[in-house]
Amino acid sequence: KWHEQNNIISTRDRTYFLQRDFFDSLSMLGHLPKGALLDIGTGAGIPGILLSFFRPDEHITLLDRRDNPIRFLEHVKLILKLENIEIVKTDINKMIMTKSPAAVIFKNFSNKVVSKLSFEAKLAYIVNMVRNNLGATSKIFLLTGSNALALQDNTSKHCDSLNGKIVITKIETPYFDTNRYILEIT
């Protein structure tokens, strides 16, 4: 019902959703540090809601600035009785946090500024946005495609420009020929 009216999830194909979005999200579990998580641009709550089932004792904030995803997330939280998630409707540039989360998560993050940027420029934009708004202590995790490979040849150059360390981990998936990656920036 929600998808038909609001296009909350990127696909109508349930199998594709399970094989890609669900699998990608669960692949992050072994990489994320213990502690509070912030899912920026969460949309349908992917990966934040999915991770909340496997980390019931950890606080997960789902951030989105759009009304439809927020209403959907509030409905899901109520129906599934998820006590460990907090839903915040705001833009990351306007968010005020008293304590930096252990990790910040992005999946398919996009806005009018970012959509026109190269992958490297998008990455720099995201890192600067997080560092400026949340402080330098949070690790940043991005679920991405093969565009992450462009960073491998020049990782030291990118690390210097981002003022941090980049770790690229391939997600081993039995479902697709294309590759997915977890980018960790510390």
Can you name each region flagged by the protein language model?
Residues 59-64:
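Conserved SAM-binding motif I beta-strand of class I
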Residues 32, 54, 132-136:
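A generic alpha-to-beta junction signature in SAM-dependent methyltransferases
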Residues 44-57:
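Conserved SAM-binding loop of SAM-dependent methyltransferases across substrates and taxa
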Residues 65-186:
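S-adenosylmethionine
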Residues 26, 49, 128:
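Active-site phosphate/pyrophosphate- and oxyanion-stabilizing loops and adjacent acidic/basic residues
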Residues 40-42:
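Conserved beta-strand/loop positions that form the S-adenosyl-L-methionine
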Residues 35-36, 58, 138:
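Surface-exposed loop/turn positions
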Residues 1-38, 68-85:
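Class I SAM-dependent transferase core
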